[in-house]
C-alpha cells in the first residue's frame, strides 16, 4: 500500500451504494477500474492485512488516489465500468484487444436489391445478416451466393449508369437488372426472396419452392427453364451439405476458454439461424496473477458492452465458465438489446456439442500461440546474446520503397517480446528529396521518428537499418545530431545488407558503416528474427507505396483536365464506380453526372481516350 495514500480516511467517505471506482498511481495514470454492488465493502477489501493475490498486492502498493462514481443500479455500474476500461486501458485490468467492428451481409432495400459486405452503423435501408467473424467469411459467402442466386453486387453508382450488362452477366453471376429487358421484375424478386430465406437459415423452404417451380416448368414443356432450375437446386444442396447446421434454428454465441502459462484464449463461435457463420479466437491482455474467473467475466463484459454499437446480440450466450455475476450480465445485456438475452453455462444436446467445439478450438489456438511466443522468445534471447545485450525487449526496423524515385514511402515495423506489434507499425511519406535518394529518405524518416520525446518503454533496444553500410552511416549521423530528452545512446544501430543474389541466409550485418561486417549461420535463431522483422518492414513499405501509387494513378489523369477540380473529380469517380468505369463511359453517360455539362463531358471523354 502506498505510504502517501491514507486508506482509513478515504474509506470513511465512501458510500455503500453501487458504483464504479478508478485507482490512480503517483503519475496520475488510471491503473485499475472496478465496479461494486457495495462500494464501501468492496474498497475496504483492498486494504486488509492479508490480500487475496500477488496481483492485488502489487496494485495496492501503487495506489495514490481513488475516484468513486455512484450509480443508481448494478447494471449502470457494469456499463460504466466497461466504458472506463475502454477509455483508460488500465494495466491491472484484463483488456480485450479488439476494436474492429464485425462485418455483415447487407441486402439493400433498392428496387433491384444488391448484396454487399457492411461494417459499422446500420443506417442504410435494408436487411443485415450476421455478424460474421471476419471479412474473409463474408466475401466467401458472397461469392457462393453469386453462383447460386445471381442478384447484383455492384455499387448503385455503377448500376445506375450502365447502358449494357457487365461481365458478371456474361458469366451468369448476375441477372442484369441494370439493363431493361434482360430479366423480369418477378424473376429478380424471386431470386432476392431465395437469398433472404437462405441467409435466414430456411434452406428447406428454398428447395421446396425451387422443386415446385421445376416440376411446373417440366409440365408446361419448358425444358430449358426446368433444367436451369434443376441446376440451381443442385447448387443449393451442395452448399447446404458443407454447412454445420442445427435443426433448432439457434441464434447464439458460444464462448469457450483456455488458460495456461499466464495466457488466456477465448474462442467465440457465431451461430445464426442454426448455421455456424464462423468463429474467432481472442487473446486478452491478462495481468500477472489474474484468475480465470476474472478473465472470463471481464472479457464477456467488454466483448458485448463495449462493442454494443457495432455488435448484434444473439438470443442466447453459452459460456464455458460459471460466472458469479451471470444474472447481472444477462440483465444488462437484455436492457441494452430491449429483449431478453439468456446466459447459459450448463447446456445439453446440440448446445453442449457447440460448447465442446468452442472449448477445443480455444485450447488448440492457445497451444499454437504459446508455441509461437516460445519461438520468438528463443530468437530474441539468441539475438541478445549475439549483440551482447542484456535483453532485446523492443526492436524497430526501417525500409524505403519507391518506383524510379517516385512516391517514396518509408516503413517502420515494431517487434516486442511477443513478436510483431502491428498496432505500432507506421508509414512515412517522404517529400522534399532528390528522387531516388534512399540515403536522404532514410535520414528524413529517422529524424521524424526519433527527433522528439519518446516514452521510456518505447525506446527500442535495437534499430535495424535495411540497406547495409551506407544506410547505417545515415542512421549514425542522424543520432549523433539528435538533441532529445531520452537516452539516444541506448538503441543499438544495426545495418543489414542483402546477400549475394538477395538470397535469405546470406545477409551481412554491420555495427559500423566502415570495416567488415559479419554473418550468422543460416540456422541461427538470431538471424531468423532479423529476417522476420526485415521482411515485415519490406512488405509494409511496399504495400504503402502501392496504395500511394494507385491513388496517384487514379486521380492524376483527371487533374490535368481543365474544369475538373477535386469536387468534380470525386463526383465522377463516385458515379462511375472508379476510373475504369469512367474510361468505359460514353459522353452521354458522363454528362449525366451532377455538375458535368455536355461540353465538359466531351472534353473528359476525349482526354481519357487520348
From Swiss-Prot:
Domain UVR positions: 204-239
The species this protein was found in: Citrobacter koseri (strain ATCC BAA-895 / CDC 4225-83 / SGSC4696)
Main location: cytoplasm
Keyword DNA damage: yes
Entry similarity comment: Belongs to the UvrC family.
GO biological process: nucleotide-excision repair; SOS response
Source species taxonomy: Bacteria, Pseudomonadati, Pseudomonadota, Gammaproteobacteria, Enterobacterales
Subunit architecture: Interacts with UvrB in an incision complex.
UniProt keyword DNA repair, yes or no: yes
Protein role: The UvrABC repair system catalyzes the recognition and processing of DNA lesions. UvrC both incises the 5' and 3' sides of the lesion. The N-terminal half is responsible for the 3' incision and the C-terminal half is responsible for the 5' incision.
GO molecular function, one term: excinuclease ABC activity
Record-given protein name: UvrABC system protein C
Compartments, as annotated in UniProt: Cytoplasm
SUPFAM superfamilies reported in the protein's UniProt record: C-terminal UvrC-binding domain of UvrB (SSF46600), GIY-YIG endonuclease (SSF82771), RuvA domain 2-like (SSF47781)
Gene3D superfamilies, per database record: 5' to 3' exonuclease, C-terminal subdomain, GIY-YIG endonuclease, UVR domain, UvrC, RNAse H endonuclease domain
Record-linked Pfam families: GIY-YIG, HHH_5, UVR, UvrC_RNaseH, UvrC_RNaseH_dom
Key words of the record: Cytoplasm, DNA damage, DNA excision, DNA repair, Excision nuclease, SOS response
SMART domains: GIYc, HhH1
Cellular component GO terms, alphabetical: cytoplasm; excinuclease repair complex
Record domain GIY-YIG: where: 16-94
